[in-house]
Every structure is written in structure tokens, then in C-alpha cells.
């Protein structure tokens, strides 16, 4: 089996090295990742300039593009053999609830949705790498176990691992996405020449972290696994809107 590994923290990030090391003796792994940190890139594709893959001394491929660019090229001709699976991560930082809309880590996995096997996105709830071995352990276990799992086509499994040593993890839970409140206001800055600018501020506080959500699971010390799909159709709204257009046109 061939696995394409990518991330959004960049090709030199410790998380992708930990993920590659965890999977290297399980499958043939190819790493294609952004040349620099592209956190928050979501599913952006680069359309205004050419992409230039560059082979690194460790065998990884660095790309001057987004996480989705990396997987897109990896599945569509850059490699001699098409990968069987896409695994993204290990992200340093949570991808919970609404975070999945912005996450390059999750987007890289979503770009692998066309393959027969489920794609995975792994995140550790820390900006520090100390507990990457915990996340790598669960990455290996879950990727190995996918062969016993029958899922609908185009399923992505979003996995968030608490920032704990392995022996302190309480277990694994299947979850739904929670929700955040509106993000904090952007932070205004002024450069020495008087030009104003803004930094995007912190994500919103947890609004729905009730039992059954990914937020609740990780706060209780459990690894959270949330199945995702691309279809964002709001079916309940469709039912509510039934007949609405007839009264307008």
C-alpha cells in the first residue's frame, strides 16, 4: 500500500516527521508538504503561478503551495504510482468544531476523498511537540485498523489527540463536531511608517462542547474521531424551504 502524507505546518515541521516515522514500516510512504507554514489555508488551490516540487535530502518533497496543492499534485500525476490513501498531520494545534472549515490539515485529507480508502487528518492539542509520540501512536493504530472499517465513499476521519502522555489517555471516542462562538476581533497594528494593518485574532470560545462533541471528548482526556464528508447541504433547511419559492416567483 502507498500512503501520501501531507500537512499544513510545513515540510520541516516535527509533526510530519513523527507521522512519517510512525507509518514508514507499515506502508510505502511519500511526503509532499508545503515549503512553509500554511496553517489556515483551508482548501485553497494555487492558480496564479506555477508550482515547483523540490526533492529534499530526507526524501520528502517540498512544494511552494498549499496543503491541497500538495495532495492534488500527488494524486494527479506528480508521482509515478498513485497513492492508495492520504494521511495528513500531525498538526500542532487542535482542529475541532468550526476549525475544520479553515484547517489546511483537514483540507489535505479532504483532497484525498476520491480514493477508495478513507483519508485521515491528525492533530495534537498543543503548539509544542512534547506529546507527538502519543499522536503518532494513535495515527499508526488507526491507519492500520482502517482495513477492518467499512465506510461510505469519500469519508475523512478527523482525529484530535489530547496533549497528554500516552499512559494518561483515557480512551477513544467517536464524536460529532462541536461549535465555536464568533472569533475575537482582529488586532489592529500600525507599522513605524504609520500604515495600519490587522492580525487575525484567536478562534472563538467553545459554544457547543456538550457530550458527544469532539470538544467534550478531548477535554475529558479522550482521543476524538469525527467522520467528515464534503457535502455541506443543510437538509433540514431544504425541508423548511419547500414551497417557499412558489410564493416568490
Curated annotation (Swiss-Prot):
User: Which SUPFAM superfamilies does this one have?
Assistant: SurE-like (SSF64167)
Ranked from the top, the taxonomy reads:
Bacteria, Pseudomonadati, Pseudomonadota, Gammaproteobacteria, Pseudomonadales
Q: Does the keyword Cytoplasm apply?
A: yes
Which HAMAP family did the record assign?
Answer: SurE
Q: Does the keyword Thylakoid apply?
A: no
Quote the catalytic activity from the record.
Answer: a ribonucleoside 5'-phosphate + H2O = a ribonucleoside + phosphate
Compartment(s) of residence: Cytoplasm
Source superkingdom: Bacteria
* Cited function: Nucleotidase that shows phosphatase activity on nucleoside 5'-monophosphates.
Keyword tags:
Cytoplasm, Hydrolase, Metal-binding, Nucleotide-binding
Q: What is its EC number?
A: 3.1.3.5
- InterPro entries named among the record's database cross-references: SurE, SurE-like_Pase/nucleotidase, SurE-like_sf
Provide the species name.
Answer: Ectopseudomonas mendocina (strain ymp) (Pseudomonas mendocina)
Family per record: Belongs to the SurE nucleotidase family.
Cofactor needs: a divalent metal cation
What Gene3D superfamilies does this protein's entry cite? Survival protein SurE-like phosphatase/nucleotidase
Name the Pfam families on file.
SurE
- Note on cofactor: Binds 1 divalent metal cation per subunit.
Task: Please report the name of this protein according to its UniProt entry.
Answer: 5'-nucleotidase SurE
A molecular-function term among this protein's GO annotations: metal ion binding
Uppermost EC category: hydrolase
Query: Record's Gene Ontology CC terms?
Result: cytoplasm
Tell me which residues bind a divalent metal cation. Answer: 8-9, 39, 91
